[in-house]
Structure formats: structure tokens, C-alpha cells
Amino acid sequence: MGKSASKQFHNEVLKAHNEYRQKHGVPPLKLCKNLNREAQQYSEALASTRILKHSPESSRGQCGENLAWASYDQTGKEVADRWYSEIKNYNFQQPGFTSGTGHFTAMVWKNTKKMGVGKASASDGSSFVVARYFPAGNVVNEGFFEENVLPPKK
């Protein structure tokens, strides 16, 4: 397997998440060693099969998950920027989950406290990134999106 996520990559992803979270007036996330380890293990599993698919919910406890694939070795900021760019499709007037905005809403979910991230390279040079969030965002209960996905501050 290729190289695993470096401390620099972890910090890049975390910094980008927290800069975006700040725009939405929600508390910063902290990196969690256990979540980093689990995300790393799963990114390596994805890289070995070269198939991008979410892990079974039962295997990640109460964690949410974002995934990213690129044909090259992607930077942490690039991954976070790509997930966050889904904000353009999010309707703050009609909050809720849609498949086209789930990466963005997971990133800025107010109640999420911790994250972990992993990256692995496949034999063809492509890279797989896994982010895990605790507690998970994108909870579809009544009122949860209104409370947790706040519009960016002016």
C-alpha cells in the first residue's frame, strides 16, 4: 500500500474544516487519535479494492463519514474545499438532507465535536480519503438540520 496520511495532512484537513465551521459560527472540531486510526484503516481498505463506498454504519458506531477519491495524491485542503463547495446546492430556506449536499452538512454540523481522517494511495496512484465525525451529523430528525446547519455569517 502507498503512504498513509501524514500529520501534516491531518492538520490541513482539520484547519480547513475549522475555518469553514467558523464561517457558520459553530465550534471547532478536535482531531481524535482513534478516529484517525479507524479512518486510516478504512482508507487503506478502499485503496486496496479501488472502490469508493461507505463503510457499514454498524462498523463505525456513532460516527458520520465523508469520502473522497482522486486520480492523484490530493491535499487536505483540496478535499475539504471540494466537500464544502456543496454549499452552493444547499437550500437554507428548506433545510434537510440531500445526497448532493451531505459532505458539506457533515463538515459544518454544529453538534459534531471530533473528527479523524485517513488517506491511502492505490497501486494506480489514485488516493482515497476518509473522514470520520463524532457524533455524526446529517441526523434527519425534525428540526435537526435547522439547529445544526447554520447559514454563513455575513
Curated annotation (Swiss-Prot):
Single GO BP term: positive regulation of epithelial to mesenchymal transition
InterPro entries per UniProt: Allrgn_V5/Tpx1_CS (IPR018244), CAP_dom (IPR014044), CAP_sf (IPR035940), CRISP-related (IPR001283), SCP_GAPR1-like (IPR034113)
Natural source organism: Homo sapiens
Name of the molecule in the record: Golgi-associated plant pathogenesis-related protein 1
Taxon lineage: Eukaryota, Metazoa, Chordata, Craniata, Vertebrata
Primary location group: Golgi
Bilayer topology: Lipid-anchor
SUPFAM superfamilies membership: PR-1-like (SSF55797)
Keywords: Coiled coil, Golgi apparatus, Lipoprotein, Membrane, Myristate
A GO MF term: protein homodimerization activity
Record has Transmembrane as a keyword: no
Lipidation (N-myristoyl glycine): 2
Assembly and binders: Homodimer. Interacts with CAV1.
Region of interest (Disordered), residue spans: 1-21
Domain SCP: 14-132
Biased composition, class Basic and acidic residues, residue ranges: 9-21
Family: Belongs to the CRISP family.
Domain of life: Eukaryota
